[in-house]
Amino acid sequence: MSIRCLAVLLFHDDEDLVADQIEYYKYKNNHDIIVFNHNSTDNTKYNIEKYSDDILCIYELSSKINFANHEVFDTIFKILDQNPNIKKNEIKISNTNGYNLNFKENYDWISFPESDEFLEGPDRKKTFYEYLCDIHNKKEITSIKYLTFTYWFTEKDDMEVESPVERIKYYCVNKPGDTSLYKTKSINGNSSAKFFTWRANKIEKTFFGHPKNNNNRNLLIWNTRHYEIREKKHLINKLKDRADNNNGCHHYKIMNEKLKTNSFYDLKSNELYFDDGINDLNMNEKFNWTKIYPYS
């Protein structure tokens, strides 16, 4: 079976992830791609444009479309819905037809991961795309929840390797500290279930993968690899940027304050599991993520 899949990618100062994201979703998982670049100050824009032939449309969002009140996400979901009520004068598009691509009609499945998230199926027997093909005829399935596996920089990382996905190999599952995935809350994790994938005609507005209503547990749970913090310099810059930026993720302010007095963000490889890229990810909660994240 062949199905039509779209990946929606949103970048903000993610110059190191652009190539990995496009390679993973387009070439390893048979997705078409649209890209939103929000007010990046590094080389993200340049790196995106290098792959312009691989992207259906690039949407450059100005700083006047901000994260406050979820405006960035509102804009993206309105474009997916072909809702004209957006600030078009604050958006530059690479494709003149960028507002008329009929996403809901032209695609079977749409995924909108975070820029540092790499979506997988429930295990590694098949690719993400192959698992989407498997469930396509199960009409009762309209969306997919994801369990987070957090990857972190360690002393084992070879900084000569540019690709974060190739360089960072140590991780631990971060199970929800709520009941969004399982009946029992985790005491070592404090993530929440994330919705990143929907049938194209059933897409639901989210904020960084979090829907307004996350009460209904869905038995279909897949995995996502989350490379949020990729080196010490990146940690410092990201926490400072997000702490000063009203993007709705208030835990960055708390983390930034802790960074000034603590060094516990420097994890050792033996605190985590090694990912060989072949075997299934380990579900055991070896590391207590509540030491890192005050809440999610």
Where are these regions (language model features)?
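N-proximal low-complexity "stem/linker" segments adjacent to membrane-targeting elements
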Residues: M1-E23
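Short, acidic, metal-binding catalytic loop of nucleotide-sugar glycosyltransferases
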Residues: E23-H31
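Ser/Thr-glycine-rich phosphate-binding loops at phosphate-binding pockets of nucleotides
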Residues: Y24, F36-T44
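Short acidic/polar active-site loop segments enriched in Thr and Asp
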Residues: H31, D108, T142
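Short beta-strand/loop segment that forms part of the nucleotide-sugar
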Residues: H31-N39, Y59-S63
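Active-site acidic Asp-centered loop
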Residues: H38, P113-S115, P122
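Active-site-proximal specificity loops/subdomain of glycosyltransferases
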Residues: K45-F112, E120-G121
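Catalytic-site signature of metal-activated, phosphate-bearing donor transferases
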Residues: N69-D74, P84, E90-N97, G121-S296
